[in-house]
Structures are given as structure tokens and as C-alpha cells.
């Protein structure tokens, strides 16, 4: 917990710096070796098997992140990338000469793996072809000064584009010959919106007909998967003709593919494309060049570049881990002086390195099996403390533990534990806030090691001599995530830091402690994310904790669109709901709740629990009669149940899998509230359709309007 272990949550977003000893795709961040300008990385024998001599490097297109070119290069290097793609508009806008860019990359340990893009080359007009060849010669001059040997040529979208494979092949042959004479190569890519060439199958046929050693393919996951093409055919392409690989994820969207590509690409693992399968096909073809990210995203290009670059590298590490299990590798291979177990998650393709001077990286332990929430810690100040503690008491929680040296109380009912942290160091902001989450796992040390290997910032801690030894990392929004093995009778359990209070009973410290109102455990925690950290948070929880996306939704809230994404472990023991406002225009017309957070407690009978809580003075959120009239029309719950829900303010949802009853409290301390939930059958949702009702009710509470609506 933030104060009981000495780590603090100040509300500032983690910088994204790599923990000491973390790795970058097969090389320690202090041992990157630049690739020479004449290197031919990416060209291997056809169908070359994955072997100890194979080393897959990582690269980041400068277009992925914000800032000037110098900012982007620094961020890529700090994150641990091996190389970059120089996006031509970034270079043209830079005050640095090509030689300066080359030297800066060398100083940072970055190779320049690609110069891109060269657009609209082929032409039906002879004079335009000559102009394009002249333009290419000038770009080749730039490439030589930059120290890169590979240029990306996109299929044409121009009105004079050719629809003749033989003529396009002939023109590309001319281009490749000019490049070859200067020690350079050309990588041809089919844009998904190309005028005529818009599939990888056709681009490969053109390259095959051109038949020039300096001409190969660039394979881009977005251009292929956005069109619904089958990537399995990539395996039939000779590996020595796969010059470059660009990776991007994306959500499935029914829109113009150009707009989809330019605004909504994501890092691997953040969207819905099956990139592990895609990468597996590319590697099966014999590709061993860089794994490069080319992601156009409006949010990423507004965000701080260094955290975005760290998120990008984390996505590649997780992708390699996911892909590895699908490849027909032997049980173990020798890598340098060590052995890499191909069955171990994290013994990624990057670890299959025989490069001299490149150490074998430590492998990431497997995804931890989670046993639920150990706790959800709230930071409170003097103003919010009475309201939060009062609501917990009305919900049947007991103050059953007190840290002996730090201002942290432990409140518990059943297996639901809520530490209240009164320390100024633990406060993310004024009022109340979720400061930390504890997740149960049998091997906290392994779970923490995995988090660090996946570039999660390890939090500093201040541990007393008799305190439990806990490890924590920072989520993208600054929330601390602890790995716990609670074990009530275990002296190393974090519970040992909280001697019982006089309010505790003999059963309070177990998972069935305290009768209360019937709360059994924490069902889920909901966290609003900063605008530029929503996708990063989903990737963090997916890669570090193994939480998979259950579903995503968009809600028409009273003050704008809210995007939700629910993630959970396979058993449903740990569920986290992430949300973000799609657009934010300030607070002058948003007198509701800023960045709300809430903790949901599970119960077997929400009506009985709510009645008991209300009688104890719980600040139950009032729901208007209009909701229940509409509910009766839509879902027609039993009349007795409907009347009880109307009386108590309980909300309801139902689908083919089951039913969901839930109740909210008023907002406590500015942004935090509680929820009681009852799941019936196999219902796995969160009652999202009721969210606008809750948001409007919270606004009424905050403004004092509609006090008599009932």
C-alpha cells in the first residue's frame, strides 16, 4: 500500500522510464550496437529457420510519437528501441542536417532502419516517371547522408497510377537498379487504399516480376488486416524478399480505410487484430529484420513522447511473447552462452540471439494466476475522511486494523479490504482517490519480476524493520499495483502490518470475517484514465497481469461521450473497468464528477444489503421514477422486485447470460463512490446501460438539483 510500504502516489503520471536492468528486445539498454549504413538487416535466406543466430530487433517510426525529431529520437532511445524509421516530414521540418541526425542516432545507439515514405512512384506518363526518378535520386542522396540503406515506396494513389503489373514491375526495376548502384534497397508496400495495388498479394506479384535483388516487400499489418486479407499467404513469399515489417493494431471500425489508418492505429495488444498470428506467418516465411511499429494515432501524437515510446516497446515485448507459443521452435536452443527455454513466456524471439557482445536478456516470468483483489486502497484527506469512513461503516465494514507507524486504517468485510490512507504523501489530489490496488497471487516475486521485464516502473518503498516485503509498480494513471499473498496466518502477509483494533472480531481477518451486510469480496474497481493513457492502461493490465478485454462500449453521458473498456483475468477474480472522456472541454459546463473512481463490492442479495445499508445511514444515490417506468417497459422484472428496486434505488440489467442488480452511493470526497453488485447466472457485464442514469444522478447530487426527484 502506498504509505504502509513507503511508496507514494502524488498524482503525477509515471515518466515511463525503464527500470534498472530491464531489457530492450534482446539487448540490455546499455549495450545497443548501431548498425552500419551498409548493413543488410532484414535479408536472410528463404525460409531461414529461427535459430540461435537469428536476432529480431525493434524499431519505432518517428511518426508514432509527438514532438520534434530530436524529441522522438531521444524518447525511442530512452525506451530501449534498437532503431527508428525516419518519417520524411519529421526530417524535412528539422533544423538538423542529415549528417547531424545520423550522428545523433549513433550517439543514442539507434540505427536508422528505414526512410519513408516515397509516394506515387509508378506513372502512366513518361515525363512523370522521369520526374519521379529524379525525385528518387535526391532522396537517395539524403539516405546516404543519414546512413540508412532502405527506402519505403508506397503503391500509388495518383490519378496517373498504372493498372498494369508488368509496367509497374518494369518501373520499379529501374528504381531498384538506381538504388543498387548506390548500395541501397527499395521496399515496396501495398497501401490498403492504393489506387490499383492495394493487397500484399498483388504487390508481391509485381516484386516477383521485377526480379531485382535490391527490390523487396514491406509487409504492414494494418494494410493487410484492415482489408480482411488472409496473412497465411505471406508464408509462401521467400524470406529474402521480405525487406521490412511494420506492425500496428487497430479496433475494428466500419469506416473509410484511409481515415481509419491515419487516426485510429494502435500499438500491438491495444486493438482487435490477431497480431500474434500475423507475426507468426511473417516469421515462418523467414523474415528476421526489425519488428517496427508504424502507428498513426491522434492521441499518441499529442502525448508526451517518452511514456508513449515505453508503451510502444512494451507492446512489442508482449507481442513477441504471445507469438512465441505459436511457432514450431524446439524445446530449447542455445543462445550465446545461455539457454533459452522456448516454452517460457518472455523467452521471446528477441532472446534468440547469437550476436557477439549482446547479452542474453532475462526472461519475463509467466502471466501470474490471480486470486482476486487483496485490497483497494483509498487516499483520503481531512475533509473526505469522515464521509468515506462513514459510508464504509454503513456498508457493514469494520475498522479492524491499524498500522502501528503510519496513518493507515484497514477496513474489512468478508474478503473485501479497504485501507484508508490519511498521509499527505498518499494523496493523489484533494479529496478521496483510489491510490493502490493489491492483487492476490501465489508468487508475488515472480509477478513483480514480470512487471519489471515489461517496463512497468517499480515504485520506491519505505519499509520498516517488521513490515511485510511487498513489491509495487505504477499503472499508467499513477495507481500503485501491489502483488500480494495475503495468507492470514502468514507472518510475511501484508495483513501482519495491521495489528487488530478493538473494533475487530476474531473472524474479521479471514475471508469470511464480519457479518456486516453480506459483502463477500471486491467485484471490480473502476478507474477513469487520463485522456492520453486509456489505450496504454489496457495494454499495461493485459501484458503485466494477463487481464483480457471483456468488451468495450461508448456511452452517451450527460456531458459528452465516455468510452469504456472492461478487462478481467480468465476466472473473473480481478476485474477492472477503464473509462475516458472522448472529448473534454473544461469544467465550466461539467458540474458533475471529475475523473470518477469507484469500488464495487459483491453480495449475494443486493436488495437486502441495500436495505441494511440504508437503515445504517449509507448515502444511497437517488434514482428517478422515470428510470423504473422505463425498466418496466423494457425488461418487465417481477413486480415485487421492481417495487423494491424503486424504493431503494437499485438498478437492473439483464442479458442472455443472466441478471445484474447494483446500487451506487453518492460521491464521497469529490470523485469516489461505492457500488453494491449482485450477479445472477453467468452475467459478466457491469450494467453499462445504466451509466447515464448514474451520471445524471451524481450531477444532481453535486449541484443540489432535483432533491425531491424520486
For each feature predicted by the language model, list its residue ranges.
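N-terminal pre-domain/capping segments
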Residues: 2-5, 10, 25, 31-148, ...
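Conserved, mostly hydrophobic/aromatic
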Residues: 76, 84, 105, 143, ...
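Glyoxalase I/VOC metalloenzyme domain signal
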Residues: 25, 35, 39-44, 54, ...
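Acidic-and-aromatic substrate-binding clefts and catalytic sites of carbohydrate-active enzymes
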Residues: 63-70, 87-98, 120-130, 158-163, ...
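Hydrophobic faces of well-ordered beta-strands that scaffold small-molecule active sites
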Residues: 56-62, 84-86, 112-117, 151-153, ...
Amino acid at each position: 500500500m502506498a504509505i504502509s510500504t513507503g511508496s507514494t502516489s502524488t498524482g503525477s503520471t509515471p515518466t515511463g522510464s525503464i527500470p534498472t536492468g530491464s531489457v530492450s528486445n534482446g539487448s540490455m539498454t546499455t549495450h545497443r550496437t548501431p548498425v552500419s549504413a551498409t548493413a543488410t538487416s532484414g535479408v536472410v535466406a528463404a525460409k531461414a529457420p529461427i535459430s540461435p543466430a537469428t536476432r529480431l530487433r525493434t524499431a519505432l517510426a518517428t511518426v508514432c510519437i509527438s514532438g520534434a525529431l530530436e524529441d522522438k529520437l531521444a524518447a525511442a532511445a530512452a525506451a530501449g528501441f534498437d532503431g527508428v524509421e525516419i518519417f520524411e516530414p519529421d526530417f524535412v521540418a528539422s533544423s538538423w542536417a542529415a549528417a547531424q541526425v545520423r550522428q545523433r542516432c549513433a550517439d543514442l545507439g539507434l540505427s536508422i532502419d528505414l526512410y519513408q515514405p516515397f509516394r506515387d512512384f509508378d506513372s502512366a506518363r513518361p515525363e512523370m516517371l522521369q520526374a519521379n526518378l529524379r525525385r528518387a535520386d535526391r532522396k537517395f542522396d539524403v539516405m546516404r547522408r543519414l546512413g540508412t540503406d532502405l527506402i519505403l515506396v508506397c503503391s500509388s494513389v495518383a490519378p496517373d497510377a498504372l493498372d498494369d503489373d508488368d509496367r509497374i514491375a518494369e518501373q520499379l526495376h529501374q528504381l531498384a537498379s538506381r538504388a543498387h548502384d548506390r548500395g541501397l534497397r527499395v521496399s515496396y508496400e501495398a497501401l490498403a487504399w492504393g489506387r490499383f495495388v492495394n493487397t500484399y498479394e498483388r504487390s508481391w506479384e509485381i516484386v516477383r516480376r521485377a526480379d531485382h535483388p535490391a527490390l523487396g516487400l514491406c509487409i504492414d499489418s494494418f494494410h493487410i488486416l484492415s482489408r480482411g486479407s488472409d496473412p497465411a499467404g505471406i508464408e509462401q513469399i521467400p524470406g529474402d524478399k521480405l525487406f521490412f515489417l511494420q506492425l500496428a493494431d487497430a479496433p475494428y471500425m466500419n469506416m473509410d480505410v484511409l481515415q481509419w489508418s491515419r487516426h485510429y492505429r494502435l500499438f500491438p495488444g491495444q486493438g482487435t487484430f490477431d497480431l500474434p498470428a500475423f507475426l507468426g506467418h511473417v516469421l515462418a516465411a523467414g523474415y528476421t529484420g526489425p519488428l517496427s511499429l508504424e502507428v498513426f494515432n491522434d492521441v499518441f501524437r499529442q502525448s508526451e513522447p517518452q511514456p508513449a515510446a515505453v508503451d510502444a516497446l512494451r507492446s512489442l515485448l508482449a507481442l513477441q511473447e504471445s507469438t512465441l507459443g505459436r511457432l514450431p521452435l524446439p524445446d530449447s536452443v542455445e543462445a550465446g552462452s545461455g539457454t533459452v527455454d522456448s516454452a517460457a513466456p518472455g523467452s521471446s524471439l528477441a532472446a534468440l540471439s547469437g550476436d557477439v557482445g549482446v547479452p542474453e536478456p532475462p526472461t519475463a516470468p509467466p502471466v501470474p494466476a490471480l486470486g482476486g483483489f487483496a485490497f483497494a486502497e483509498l487516499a483520503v484527506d481531512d475533509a473526505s475522511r469522515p464521509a468515506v469512513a462513514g459510508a464504509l461503516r454503513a456498508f457493514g465494514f469494520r475498522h479492524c486494523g491499524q498500522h502501528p507507524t503510519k496513518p493507515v486504517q484497514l477496513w474489512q468485510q468478508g474478503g473485501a479490504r479497504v485501507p484508508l490512507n490519511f498521509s499527505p504523501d498518499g494523496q493523489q489530489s484533494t479529496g478521496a482517490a483510489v491510490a493502490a490496488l493489491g492483487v492476490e497471487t501465489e508468487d508475488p516475486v515472480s509477478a513483480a519480476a514480470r512487471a519489471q521485464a515489461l517496463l512497468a516502473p517499480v515504485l520506491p518503498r519505505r519499509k520498516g524493520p517488521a513490515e511485510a516485503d511487498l513489491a509495487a509498480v505504477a499503472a499508467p494513471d499513477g495507481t500503485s499495483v501491489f502483488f500480494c499473498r495475503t495468507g492470514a496466518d502468514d507472518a510475511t502477509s501484508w495483513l501482519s502490518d495491521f495489528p487488530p483494533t478493538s473494533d475487530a472480531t476474531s473472524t474479521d481477518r479471514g475471508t469470511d470475517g464480519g457479518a456486516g451486510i453480506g459483502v463477500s469480496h471486491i467485484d471490480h474497481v473502476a478507474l477513469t484514465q487520463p485522456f492520453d493513457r486509456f489505450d496504454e492502461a489496457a495494454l499495461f493490465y493485459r501484458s503485466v497481469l494477463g487481464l483480457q478485454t471483456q468488451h468495450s462500449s461508448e456511452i452517451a453521458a450527460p456531458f459528452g461521450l465516455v468510452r469504456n473498456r472492461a478487462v478481467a483475468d480468465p476466472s473473473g477474480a480481478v476485474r477492472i473497468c477503464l473509462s475516458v472522456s472522448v472529448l473534454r472541454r473544461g469544467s465550466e459546463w461539467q458540474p458533475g464528477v471529475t475523473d470518477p473512481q469507484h469500488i464495487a463490492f459483491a453480495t449475494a442479495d443486493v436488495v437486502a444489503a441495500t436495505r441494511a445499508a440504508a437503515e445504517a445511514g449509507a448515502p444511497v444515490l437517488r434514482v428517478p421514477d422515470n428510470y423504473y417506468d422505463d425498466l418496466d417497459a423494457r425488461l418487465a422484472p417481477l413486480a415485487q422486485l421492481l417495487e423494491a428496486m424503486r424504493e431503494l434505488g437499485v438498478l437492473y440489467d439483464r442479458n442472455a447470460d443472466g441478471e445484474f442488480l447494483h446500487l451506487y452511493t453518492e460521491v464521497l470526497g469529490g470523485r469516489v463512490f461505492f457500488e453494491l453488485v449482485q450477479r445472477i447466472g453467468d452475467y459478466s457485464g457491469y450494467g453499462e446501460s445504466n451509466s447515464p442514469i448514474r451520471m445524471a444522478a451524481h450531477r444532481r447530487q453535486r449541484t443540489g438539483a432535483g432533491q425531491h426527484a424520486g
